Amino acid sequence: MAHPIRKTHPLLKIINGSFVDLPTPSNISYLWNFGSLLGICLITQIATGLFLAMHYTADTSSAFSSVVHICRDVNYGWLVRNIHANGASFFFICIYLHIGRGLYYGSYMYKETWNIGVILLFLVMATAFVGYVLPWGQMSFWGATVITNLLSAVPYMGDSLVQWIWGGFSVDKATLTRFFAFHFLFPFLIVGASILHLLFLHETGSNNPTGISSNTDKLPFHPYFSYKDTLGFLIMLMMLTLLSMLSPNLLGDPDNFTPANPLVTPPHIQPEWYFLFAYAILRSIPNKLGGVLALLASIMILMLIPMIHTSKQRSLTFRPMTQFLFWLMVSNTLILTWIGGQPVEQPFIEIGQAASILYFLLFIIFMPLSGWWENKLMKW
């Protein structure tokens, strides 16, 4: 009997093993869609970004006007630009939901997959940061100045490091040019890391909502989950199109409609909404180096989670106490996001500091303690 070509062709059999005949747990919910949605986000961002790069000029004197030119004179340039800008927001919505699902259902126990995922998060954040500088508006310029300046907190070599990143003594033409180069390069690194992420995931197979082995009950990925994913694609792309058409500037900063001016500081310097939680943690520590370390720790803490998992159960499905702590962590992160967008004054300073302390306590102490306590209760 002849085998289908998809099972014998050297290239097609890799695709077949990943997207067609892949054994998938029968009970995974729509929360497992976000990985494929992130793939679609990445493809959309690379495609729209490529067309934007064809018309963009990475020069301080013409960057802002080149973006205006794209929106006014290029055929459907306004749409490509709006989809690219709002696509970044959808990328982060999907990535945070994807991480949240991983935390809730214990997917972090696949350590290699999880750690590559955290590296991917860093890469996506770096890409979004350098991309935000490119339109060369007020918030682009001052955001770049403030965030790159944080490197001056590095002992001994901080100032040299900042000037090396800037390519001079301030954020200027050299900075913009290299940020454009980085913004073009990083998505391809993300594609490479995503392939590794999938490679390691397919070594173990997917987790499922119960957190127990599903080897006795698997389905082929196609047609069941390929159609399930397609519904997710349609919903997300429809929402992205609606936002880009009807309210394209909803998630942006009005300050970025003003060309960059090194002589005028905006009243509130803040990053895009998806970085506000980390920005709030950074601001809650009065010491510069301490703030930078806390900022890094707020993301790096994800790598620690597999090591401090104490429960005998993998998922939170049957762990009500840790479930409460998980939702407390989600609420706390939303509070930090709100605080990050507020001015540095009373009572926001205290709220930010309390939320920052709780953020780290939940991950490092409360959740492991709760897992240990639930183990004890199981013996009764």
Swiss-Prot record:
Transmembrane stretches, start-end: 34-54, 78-99, 114-134, 179-199, 227-247, 289-309, 321-341, 348-368
The record describes how the cofactor is bound as: Binds 2 heme b groups non-covalently.
Give the UniProt record's GO annotations in the biological process aspect.
Answer: mitochondrial electron transport, ubiquinol to cytochrome c
Indicate where this protein is primarily found.
Answer: mitochondrion
Indicate yes or no for the key word Transcription. Answer: no
Report the subcellular localization.
Answer: Mitochondrion inner membrane
Q: Where do the annotations place heme b b562 binding?
A: 84, 183
Q: Which Gene3D superfamilies match?
A: Cytochrome Bc1 Complex, Chain C
- Residues recorded as binding heme b b566, renumbered to this chain, are 98, 197
The record's InterPro entries line, in alphabetical order, gives: Cyt_b/b6_C, Cyt_b/b6_C_sf, Cyt_b/b6_N, Cytb/b6-like_sf, Cytochrome_b, Cytochrome_b_C_euk/bac, Cytochrome_b_N_euk/bac, Di-haem_cyt_TM
> One GO CC annotation, please?
respiratory chain complex III
Report the sequence similarity comment from the record: Belongs to the cytochrome b family.
Q: How is the quaternary structure described?
A: The cytochrome bc1 complex contains 3 respiratory subunits (MT-CYB, CYC1 and UQCRFS1), 2 core proteins (UQCRC1 and UQCRC2) and probably 6 low-molecular weight proteins.
Q: What does this protein do?
A: Component of the ubiquinol-cytochrome c reductase complex (complex III or cytochrome b-c1 complex) that is part of the mitochondrial respiratory chain. The b-c1 complex mediates electron transfer from ubiquinol to cytochrome c. Contributes to the generation of a proton gradient across the mitochondrial membrane that is then used for ATP synthesis.
Protein name stated in the entry? Cytochrome b
| Lineage, highest ranks first | Eukaryota, Metazoa, Chordata, Craniata, Vertebrata
